[in-house]
Each structure stands twice: as C-alpha cells, then as structure tokens.
UniProtKB/Swiss-Prot annotation:
Function in brief: One of the primary rRNA binding proteins, it binds directly to 16S rRNA where it nucleates assembly of the head domain of the 30S subunit. Is located at the subunit interface close to the decoding center, probably blocks exit of the E-site tRNA.
Keyword Endoplasmic reticulum: no
Annotated protein name in UniProt: Small ribosomal subunit protein uS7
Source species, domain of life: Bacteria
Provenance organism: Synechococcus sp. (strain WH7803)
Length: 156
C-alpha cells in the first residue's frame, strides 16, 4: 500500500452553461483526448435535441435518466480459501452516480445513430423512460447481487 496521504477529493463545480454538477461529470466522461469544448458542444446539442423532442426541461430529464441508471448494489469478487465469491455490496452514492454516467456514455457510443449528440439524447430519453441499455445494465447488476445474496456475510 501507498505510504503517502490520500489525495484530497476536489469538489465538482457546476457546469457554466447548465449550472449543474451532473452535467460537469458527464462532460468529463464524454471528453476524449482532453477536448473539453467538443464534449460540451455534444452535451448542449443533445440537450437541445431532448428539448425539441420532449418539449420539457432537458436538465430534469437528464437527472431522471441518471437516477434510473444508478445501481444500489453491486457484486465484488472476494477470495476466501482458494474460492472466489461474488459478494453483493451496497454502492455509495458517488460511485453509483459515476457508474450510471459511465454506462450512459458507453451505451450511447455503442448505439446506431448519426452524431454522438443524437445517440446521447436517445440513450438519455430511454433511461428517463426506464428503458435503454444503461437501465438494463443496472437491472442485471441488481439481479447478480440478488443471486449471490448467500455470500453477503463475506462483506468486507
């Protein structure tokens, strides 16, 4: 283990355009090769598409989508006497949100569509309606934890 002190966690500042912390976190996940302005443009285009299609507030829809994709439990591998068990553990709120954003971005990239903004908008709208790949991934994670409930006493 490292002998240094743990790094101080920096606070996430709200996005300048949408005044939202989750938007800042999503821009960081969308960004490739340090191109932040491109990631911000993709997000603003996706939000404008969502606004056109739904007629509602895209920020509210985005927050609903993240909430619907956030897992509450996950399984972690734990070695006990030569056997590896999948131990279900509760997910801290920060980690759950980070996982949800990661899944939303990765499944957006995997979607068929023209631009990344359109793919992201589609995935966010699906997640807000409790459909889409990110929500399905969350359900799979919960099912896996439920199936391995017998190993919950190995929690560390």
């Amino acid at each position: 283990m490292s002998r240094r002190n743990a790094a101080v966690k920096r606070p996430v500042l709200p996005d300048p355009q949408f005044n939202n912390r989750l938007a800042t976190m999503l821009v960081a996940r969308l960004m490739k090769h340090g191109k932040k302005s491109t990631a911000q443009r993709i997000l603003s285009d996706a939000f404008s598409l969502i606004g056109e299609r739904t007629g509602g507030d895209p920020i509210e829809l985005f927050e609903t989508a993240v909430k619907n994709a956030t897992p509450l439990v996950e399984v972690r591998a734990r070695r006990v006497g030569g056997a590896t068990y999948q131990v279900p553990m509760e997910v801290r709120q920060e980690r759950g949100t980070a996982m949800a954003l990661r899944w939303l971005v990765s499944f957006s990239r995997a979607r068929n569509g023209r631009s990344m903004a359109q793919k992201l908008a589609g995935e966010l709208m699906d997640a807000a309606n409790e459909a889409g790949s990110a929500v399905r991934k969350r359900e799979e994670t919960h099912k896996m934890a439920e199936a391995n409930k017998a190993f919950a006493h190995y929690r560390y």
